[in-house]
Amino acid sequence: MAPRWDSLYPYYMSLDMHPDGDFSSCAVRLSMALHHADAFSKSGYRRAGNKVSSHGWAMGAEQLYRWLRLHQLGAAQQLPVDGTDPSQYPSQNGIVYLRDCFVRTSDRSTDARTGDHIDLFVAGQGLLSAIRWPVEFPGGPFAIIGTCRDGKVRFWPAS
């Protein structure tokens, strides 16, 4: 069942950029918002063998994406990869997962992106993290979507 936007969005907006002090802050933030919207169980996530933060929140965008797909939300829609045209993207709010969209410090080159990101998507505006913390997302709230090197951009609409 899709999480309610009116529960996800305000809670997410109240969070700090690094709410649990963990490196994988996008997964931590989203799992906190999903928990607030009754769409995430810390104990169920941990029992499934997923990596969790010191406070039991999801760590790692790809693990959270897989868990949501298998246990919570079902299959997600595939979105276009070009991050330059906002009209290509859904006209509704939801959750977006981006695979291999940024360079980690351990990557050997800028062409070898292995960093994933999971976030709330605001219809007509882009990634919520990029709207809230623009210095972390140069190029604007749609630009990072266009950097996904294998076209793995997935979307679940919120209710």
Language-model segments: which ranges?
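N-terminal capping segments
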Residues: 1-55
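Extracellular cell-wall/glycan-interacting regions and their flexible linkers
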Residues: 26, 59-62, 156-159
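...with weaker cross-activation on analogous glycine-rich loops/strands in unrelated enzymes
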Residues: 48-131
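Glycine-rich, aromatic-bearing surface loops/beta-hairpins
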Residues: 115-159
